[in-house]
């Protein structure tokens, strides 16, 4: 491919968001978003060449109608390597751009460990076949959690926080539960969360790992598609009803998921793009659909990996928001990786306030007291009439500007300050935080400077109001209207974040 296009005499520049010359990248999958300026009617593709470890990776990617492009590269190698130099060359029409940066895998004392949960089998399967399936599923989990790690970094960088993402503790490990497959399939997701959390805490391998959080997938998830087909009810609720040993639930130190949607997930890096764009229709008589009614493999992949981002956010102490990853937006993960997709108008997810979600915690870390609270989730779908024209326009602009998949400002502040996401954090001895609510003065006081205060609804952890404290202060006085919700109606609780990453939930009846 030549650097110029025959017939085009314009001078073009290639612009790249976030990645800058001499930058340091700390996550192994690198997502690059950019554009050709000004637009070129002749150029259809951009050529990208990444030089790393004396080898070249080349990609040709399509430009969108607005001359935008996205690229995804795999930088992975031994996690113990020193910083490696990388060189990225981009060419399109007359535009050329060269960026030199370094890749240094993240190091932090606070990590996330992937687990593949195996329950006790009543009937023994062939050992070799079972072990092979476990290896394949662990590899699939590893790849897709690396993508989640990349997306967290990409979206937090877009919010102004560089190198903020979680550190993986290593590859996915098989975890043997004390629960049988029959018991798991007879349990609801709240009970599964409690049982598996207890198993992890009681295990010799993981029980004393206070600086680990876990992302776990249940191996024996089963879908009764025949019953769904017989009922002719293909609603989200009915499909979910016929999933056994399934969960999508996060909080404290554990984010727990089923494995029934792995059919739509990529097993290898080269398959990621094809999986996210896969328009194959889901045969609901055989496979469960979880795509927010898109009914495609790509929709299932987007919604279920988006759900991993959402539930993992709860493990990082995030509440619910109306929009973005922690609200209605996690279905739109496909838009993070693609360009020129049509505007999507999906049914709204509503908070399931009846769900008594898991209240146990898998971490004994005193700084995460708020993460053990019950968190109802955006699990139900509300089918609505065609949106009004102004709503359609709002949707278009939202999806055009930030993919509809983003962390709202308050969530980004929490994540940027959180110990599990701050870069290169050692197991340092920090001043123990003492955070209190003083009813007499309607104040929140702390011995560590306050960074953010949120007021969240008791029923669904939806953030009603937040206050970002940019100046170092040890006191925050709640406005009268917020104090009324907290102390008089007692319909809300306060979530508090300090500058050293301590978090605490405060209510009027708590000390």
Regions found by a protein language model. Give the residues of each.
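Beta-strand-enriched, solvent-exposed domains that form extended recognition/catalytic surfaces
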Residues: 2-110, 434-511
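Propeptide-to-catalytic entry region of secreted or membrane-anchored zinc metalloproteases
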Residues: 42, 53-254, 259-262, 272, ...
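Eukaryotic short linear interaction motifs
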Residues: 121-125, 224-226, 264-265, 323-325, ...
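Active-site rim elements
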Residues: 135, 291-302
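Compositionally biased low-complexity segments, especially N-terminal hydrophobic helices
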Residues: 159, 190-193, 357-370
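Fold-level signal for large, globular catalytic cores of enzyme and receptor domains
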Residues: 243-245, 260-296
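Active-site recognition of the HExxH zinc-binding catalytic motif
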Residues: 302-319
């Amino acid at each position: 491919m030549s650097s110029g296009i025959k017939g085009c005499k314009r001078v073009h520049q290639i612009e790249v968001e976030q990645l800058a010359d001499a930058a340091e990248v700390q996550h192994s999958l690198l997502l690059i978003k950019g554009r050709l300026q000004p637009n070129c009617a002749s150029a259809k593709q951009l050529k990208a060449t990444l030089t790393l470890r004396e080898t070249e990776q080349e990609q040709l990617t399509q430009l969108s109608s607005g001359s935008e492009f996205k690229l995804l590269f795999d930088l992975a190698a031994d996690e113990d390597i020193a910083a490696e130099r990388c060189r990225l060359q981009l060419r399109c029409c007359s535009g050329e751009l060269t960026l030199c940066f370094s890749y240094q895998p993240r190091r932090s004392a606070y990590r996330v460990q992937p687990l593949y949960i195996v329950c006790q089998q009543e009937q023994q399967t062939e050992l070799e076949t079972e072990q092979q399936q476990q290896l394949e599923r662990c590899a699939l989990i590893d790849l897709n959690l690396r993508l989640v790690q990349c997306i967290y970094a990409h979206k937090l960088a877009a919010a102004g926080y560089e190198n903020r993402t979680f550190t993986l503790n290593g590859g996915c490990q098989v975890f043997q539960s004390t629960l049988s497959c029959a018991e798991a399939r007879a349990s609801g997701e709240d009970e599964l969360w409690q049982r598996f959390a207890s198993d992890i805490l009681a295990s010799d391998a993981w029980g004393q790992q206070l600086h680990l959080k876990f992302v776990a997938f249940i191996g024996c998830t089963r879908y009764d598609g025949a019953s769904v087909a017989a009922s002719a009810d293909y609603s989200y609720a009915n499909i979910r009803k016929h999933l056994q040993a399934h969960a999508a639930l996060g909080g404290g130190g554990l984010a727990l998921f089923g494995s029934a949607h792995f059919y739509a997930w990529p097993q290898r890096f080269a398959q990621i793009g094809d999986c996210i764009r896969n328009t194959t229709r889901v045969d609901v008589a055989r496979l469960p659909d979880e795509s927010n009614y898109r009914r495609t493999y790509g929709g299932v992949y987007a919604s279920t990996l988006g759900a991993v981002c959402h539930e993992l956010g709860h493990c990082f102490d995030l509440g619910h928001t109306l929009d973005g990853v922690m609200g209605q937006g996690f279905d739109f993960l496909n838009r993070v990786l693609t360009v020129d997709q049509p505007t999507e108008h999906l049914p709204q997810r509503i908070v399931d306030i009846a769900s008594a979600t898991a209240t146990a915690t898998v971490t004994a870390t005193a700084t995460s007291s708020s993460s053990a609270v019950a968190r109802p989730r955006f699990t139900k779908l509300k089918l609505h009439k065609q949106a009004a024209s102004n709503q359609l326009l709002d949707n278009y602009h939202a999806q055009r500007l930030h993919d509809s998949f983003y962390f709202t400002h308050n969530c980004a502040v929490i994540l940027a300050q959180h110990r599990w996401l701050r870069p290169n954090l050692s197991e340092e001895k920090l001043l123990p935080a003492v955070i209190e609510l003083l009813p007499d003065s309607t104040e929140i006081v702390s011995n560590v400077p306050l960074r953010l205060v949120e007021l969240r609804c008791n029923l669904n952890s939806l953030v009603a109001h937040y206050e970002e404290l940019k100046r170092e202060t040890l006191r925050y006085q709640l406005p009268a209207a917020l104090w009324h919700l907290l102390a008089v109606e007692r319909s809300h609780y306060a979530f508090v974040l300090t500058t050293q990453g301590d978090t605490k939930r405060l209510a009027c009846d708590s000390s």
